[in-house]
């Protein structure tokens, strides 16, 4: 996404980059704008956004379609409780549709709720790789 563009225009560009045609973008745009929860700020340039506002916009665009692989990096750590809850629900929908979600998070409850498999990285090295409960038990014991 581009800082010099408005949030709305970034949504359009982001959806076009995901392979949607202009008509599909027009149809999807209102729902994506609403999901961001940015209100009137959606028509401001992204360079004026806080980091949380940027994260909301990025997450909304990335999850507006059904990619085969979705990478989410700490996105559920931003925003108010309502946004975090609807973001978690959106991730659940992607997982239910057999999509692969790679979630980067330090939030153990989020990991427990969202992940079937966990890879614990520390200092760039894999410490553990396996079922969520097993890896988190090792992590918590360390």
How does the language model describe each region?
Residues 129-130:
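ABC ATPase "signature
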Residues 22, 26, 32-48:
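Conserved ABC nucleotide-binding domain
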Residues 5-16:
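Q-loop/switch helix immediately C-terminal to the Walker
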Residues 84-97:
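Helical segment within the ABC ATPase nucleotide-binding domain
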Residues 64-72:
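A short, proline-enriched helix->beta-strand linker immediately N-terminal to the Walker B motif
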Residues 111-113:
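A short, surface-exposed alpha-helical micro-motif characterized by mixed small hydrophobic
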Residues 105-106:
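H-loop/switch region of ABC-family ATPase nucleotide-binding domains
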